[in-house]
């Protein structure tokens, strides 16, 4: 529940209203997982229902601020102290697609793998380019489409770099997995060809059709 706890982490630094939370969440993650304001306020309503945040007044413009409670702070610290569970991994669309493709007749599975590899390699190149620009001190994109201050290796910039590097490592692993899938597919094709050849050898040859022998006609 990263959004829920991400908002608690921001509120632990002081009261904020919905749009501020959205902007700061996206700034710290490099807008990798964009949020809409409605999603933020829906999450805040659930946090308030669970006693983890409380309304903290409004400003002159009518923005409703929220503050974290002691219970919310305790849940946040428990989240930081606990490993992310991997026993129930989130759904992965690519894994589901390939699992279905290999079981549905008529799907060109190698073509699916090759298409995904091209896309993943392009994404990997883009992520690597962004990392190079950040480390070179260039500006980085923001959630609103503008640019942030130059990367200085601290605060939100460091948070964004960590997220970016996670995407790089994740995409590298995905490309390696796609290579592995292609190897598996080639092995399966070889096994199927060997079985087909064996079946042809084991099939008994069809018996020759009996030759029809007619009686010789005699003439008087």
Residue ranges and their predicted role:
Residues 67, 97-99, 163:
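Conserved beta-strand segments that form the floor/walls of ligand-binding pockets within enzyme
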Residues 48, 73, 121-128, 172, ...:
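Structural signal for well-ordered, non-membrane alpha-helices
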Residues 113, 130-220:
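Charged, low-complexity intrinsically disordered regulatory/assembly segments
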Residues 25, 44, 117, 124, ...:
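Short amphipathic alpha-helical/adjacent loop interface patches that line ligand
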Residues 78-134:
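Amphipathic alpha-helical dimerization/coiled-coil segments
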Residues 12, 16, 30, 85, ...:
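Residues in soluble alpha-helical coiled-coils and helical-bundle/repeat scaffolds
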Residues 1-93:
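Basic helix-turn-helix/winged-helix DNA-binding cores
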């Amino acid at each position: 529940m990263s959004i829920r706890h991400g908002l608690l982490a921001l509120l632990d630094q002081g009261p904020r209203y919905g749009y501020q939370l959205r902007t700061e969440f996206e700034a710290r993650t490099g807008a990798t997982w964009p949020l809409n304001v409605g999603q933020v306020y829906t999450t805040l309503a659930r946090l308030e229902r669970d006693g983890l945040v409380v309304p903290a007044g409004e400003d002159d413009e009518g923005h409703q601020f929220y503050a974290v409670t002691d219970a919310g702070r305790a849940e946040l610290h428990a989240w930081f102290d606990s490993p992310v569970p991997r026993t129930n991994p989130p759904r992965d669309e690519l894994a589901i697609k390939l699992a279905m493709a290999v079981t549905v007749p008529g799907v060109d599975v190698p073509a699916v793998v090759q298409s995904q590899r091209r896309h993943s390699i392009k994404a990997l190149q883009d992520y690597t380019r962004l990392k190079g620009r950040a480390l070179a001190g260039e500006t980085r994109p923001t959630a609103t489409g503008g640019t942030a201050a130059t990367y200085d290796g601290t605060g939100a910039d460091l948070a964004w770099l960590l997220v970016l590097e996670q995407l790089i490592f994740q995409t590298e692993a995905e490309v390696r997995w796609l290579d592995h899938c292609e190897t598996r597919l080639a092995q399966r094709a070889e096994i199927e060809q060997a079985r087909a050849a064996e079946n042809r050898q084991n099939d008994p040859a069809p018996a020759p059709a009996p030759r029809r022998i007619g009686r010789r006609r005699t003439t008087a």
